[in-house]
Amino acid sequence: MAAKIRRDDEVIVLTGKDKGKRGKVKNVLSSGKVIVEGINLVKKHQKPVPALNQPGGIVEKEAAIQVSNVAIFNTATGKADRVGFRFEDGKKVRFFKSNSETIK
């Protein structure tokens, strides 16, 4: 099945502590999760790695969030939207369900 949300899509969080926040998808994981820029930040305690000259400490980084908890953001309407698929010139393309506009 084709992915409805892909890397570099702008998404909005639907549920959880970051509800309503927007960000760009950095990575889509095969486990049905996505990593979004600036969303679901967690603090990770990291050991120093002298071989790589990497200091230890508490590092803040993005954690994965379920793909069902985010929706693609439609800039034309300014709201979250659903994604559909159709064929244009023999190619499968994604489109916004609300206004039938093709996504990138």
From Swiss-Prot:
One of its GO terms (molecular function) is rRNA binding. One of its GO terms (biological process) is translation. Pfam families: KOW, ribosomal_L24. Keywords: Ribonucleoprotein, Ribosomal protein, RNA-binding, rRNA-binding. InterPro entries: KOW, Rib_uL2_dom2, Ribosomal_uL24, Ribosomal_uL24_CS, Ribosomal_uL24_KOW, Translation_prot_SH3-like_sf. CDD domains: KOW_RPL26 (cd06089). GO terms for cellular component: cytosol; ribonucleoprotein complex; ribosome. One of two assembly initiator proteins, it binds directly to the 5'-end of the 23S rRNA, where it nucleates assembly of the 50S subunit. One of the proteins that surrounds the polypeptide exit tunnel on the outside of the subunit. Belongs to the universal ribosomal protein uL24 family. Part of the 50S ribosomal subunit. This is Large ribosomal subunit protein uL24. It comes from Salmonella typhi.
